[in-house]
A protein has these predicted regions:
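Acidic, contiguous segments within the catalytic cores of piggyBac-derived transposases
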Residues: 1-250
């Protein structure tokens, strides 16, 4: 990498990335603390790689995309090459988990950006929302950075589009149909479960009453079910799912 007098080599870039990975689990209030001379604060892994000044120099000048070739309408185009590379690496050896989860993750960010979100009542309230497909032990297979409302978005609900994108990844990278998807009530709906059933994909998740196609109307209200003994449940089915009930109310 050479720009404005900044010169580096692949080995140094790998060390730079290593320091960033280190900061993911060894958290400090400021980057300079990793180079502290205090034995209970400084991180020897960072100190042995490069100086703090060199780390900040590379960080200031590092670019992941050519500014002359940015994709119009892609709010994350400056990091798109990186997360496409990550997605490719995640599935390099296939998809080896049977149970898969789709959920959101938040990357903390307090600066100004068109894709930055404010999420009230969340542990991390400001940052980028990322949809992630993971195995049951947390291993990530695919991620989609949410870029807020799309101008020409299709009429299909966002939650369904996210799940469908993840299913496409599963079908492209896995040779088995034994996978089961787990997700929360942001994604789940009767129509989504029908779509997944047609794609031979098993799924389970919580659901909001108004998305259950009337199932909530024939089942006990939450307040009444809570009065039952521990472990009490209800179920109803549309008759089209032979293995398990369509809805279970616990």
């Amino acid at each position: 990498m050479q720009q404005l007098g900044i010169h580096s080599v692949p080995q140094e870039i790998r060390q730079f990335i290593g320091v960033i990975l280190l900061s993911g689990y060894n958290c400090q209030p400021e980057a300079k603390h990793y180079w502290s001379t205090q034995p209970d604060i400084g991180a020897q892994g960072a100190i042995s790689c490069m100086s703090h000044n060199r780390f900040m120099e590379i960080k200031n000048y590092l670019h992941l995309a050519d500014n002359q070739k940015l994709v119009e309408g892609d709010k994350m185009s400056k990091v798109t090459p990186l997360y496409k590379l990550l997605n490719s690496s995640f599935v390099k050896h296939g998809m080896f988990h049977e149970k898969l989860s789709v959920d959101e993750s938040i990357v903390p960010y307090f600066g100004r950006h068109a894709a930055k979100m404010f999420l009230k009542c969340k542990p991390i309230q400001f940052g980028y929302k990322v949809w992630i497909l993971c195995g049951n032990d947390g291993y990530p297979y695919h991620m989609i950075i949410y870029q807020r409302k799309e101008i020409h978005a299709p009429k299909v609900p966002l939650s369904t589009r996210v799940i469908r994108s993840m299913v496409d990844v599963i079908q492209e990278t896995s040779n088995t149909t034994r996978h089961a998807l787990y997700f929360d009530n942001f994604f789940n709906s009767y129509d989504l479960l029908v779509m997944l059933s047609e794609l031979k994909m098993r799924a389970i998740g919580t659901i909001r009453p108004y998305r259950s196609k009337g199932a909530d109307a024939v089942m006990l209200p939450d307040k009444d079910l809570m009065k039952q003994k521990r472990g009490a449940f209800e179920f109803c089915s549309d008759g089209n799912i032979p293995e398990k009930p369509a809805y279970v109310h616990i």
